[in-house]
């Protein structure tokens, strides 16, 4: 059975968030097209993730080195590892997220920090880091109200680019993508822009 992890990195309702609307559209179509797959949903805004602080980082480093952890270090390391284990157990992963303030929501950044562990998602070699999860199939559903694919704001796009770089670090270099942009910058075209993205999400979900 194929294990599929759906990750939602936006706490707004679908009627107020294009990335959440894409998530729900993709999820509905995927379940219809792949009825035998095991689907798990992870809402990062409901998960109440503790930030990747010095104590968590210390605990993970000590654990990797075989050293003794304090009770708080162990508690936090266990939380990070539980999310990493869930990610590693998935054959396919769908990530839906917006561009907020040129980047990703803090909850999503924290989650990606949990995943970024040497020996698990990547390893160090004499020639630099090498990803360890290249076999994962990933779909990225991203929405940004402005225009960032080209023009004067292109260099400000640190949402999709950041996530793609993190995944490439893990060995996942060619994720599937649905990108909706410009619906706030061009309100007269918003309905058509969002509709086109929704159709793209449906078609990708069918074959993902």
Curated annotation (Swiss-Prot):
Keywords, comma-separated and alphabetical: Flavoprotein, FMN, NAD, Oxidoreductase
Any Pfam family hit: Flavodoxin_2
Molecular function (Gene Ontology), one example: oxidoreductase activity, acting on NAD(P)H, quinone or similar compound as acceptor
InterPro entries: Flavodoxin_fold, Flavoprotein-like_sf, FMN-dep_NADH:Q_OxRdtase_AzoR1, NADH:quinone_OxRdtase_FMN_depd
Domain of life: Bacteria
Catalytic activity: 2 a quinone + NADH + H(+) = 2 a 1,4-benzosemiquinone + NAD(+); N,N-dimethyl-1,4-phenylenediamine + anthranilate + 2 NAD(+) = 2-(4-dimethylaminophenyl)diazenylbenzoate + 2 NADH + 2 H(+)
Listed EC numbers: 1.6.5.-, 1.7.1.17
Cofactor(s) for this UniProt protein: FMN
Gene3D superfamilies xrefs: 3.40.50.360
Membership in a protein family: Belongs to the azoreductase type 1 family.
Record note on quaternary structure: Homodimer.
PANTHER family: FMN-DEPENDENT NADH-AZOREDUCTASE 1 (PTHR43741), FMN-DEPENDENT NADH:QUINONE OXIDOREDUCTASE (PTHR43741:SF4)
Protein name per Swiss-Prot or TrEMBL: FMN-dependent NADH:quinone oxidoreductase 1
Organism: Listeria monocytogenes serovar 1/2a (strain ATCC BAA-679 / EGD-e)
Gene that encodes the chain: azoR1
């Amino acid at each position: 059975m194929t294990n599929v992890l759906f990750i939602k990195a936006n706490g707004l309702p679908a009627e107020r968030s294009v990335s959440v609307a894409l998530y729900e559209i993709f999820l509905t179509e995927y379940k219809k097209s792949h009825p035998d797959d095991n689907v798990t949903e992870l809402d990062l805004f409901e998960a109440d993730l503790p930030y990747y602080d010095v104590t968590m980082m210390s605990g993970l480093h000590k654990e990797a080195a075989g050293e003794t952890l304090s009770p708080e270090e162990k508690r936090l390391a266990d939380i990070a590892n539980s999310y990493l284990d869930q990610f590693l157990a998935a054959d396919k992963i769908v990530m839906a997220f917006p561009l907020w303030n040129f980047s990703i929501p803090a909850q999503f950044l924290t989650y990606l920090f949990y995943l970024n562990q040497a020996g698990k998602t990547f390893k160090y070699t004499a020639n630099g880091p090498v990803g360890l999860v290249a076999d994962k199939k990933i779909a990225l559903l991203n929405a940004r109200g402005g225009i960032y694919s080209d023009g004067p704001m292109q260099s400000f796009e640190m949402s999709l680019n950041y996530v793609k770089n993190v995944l490439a670090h893990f060995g996942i270099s060619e994720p599937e993508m649905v990108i909706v942009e410009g619906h706030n910058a061009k309100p007269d075209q918003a309905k058509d822009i969002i509709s086109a993205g929704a159709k793209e999400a449906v078609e990708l979900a069918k074959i993902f």
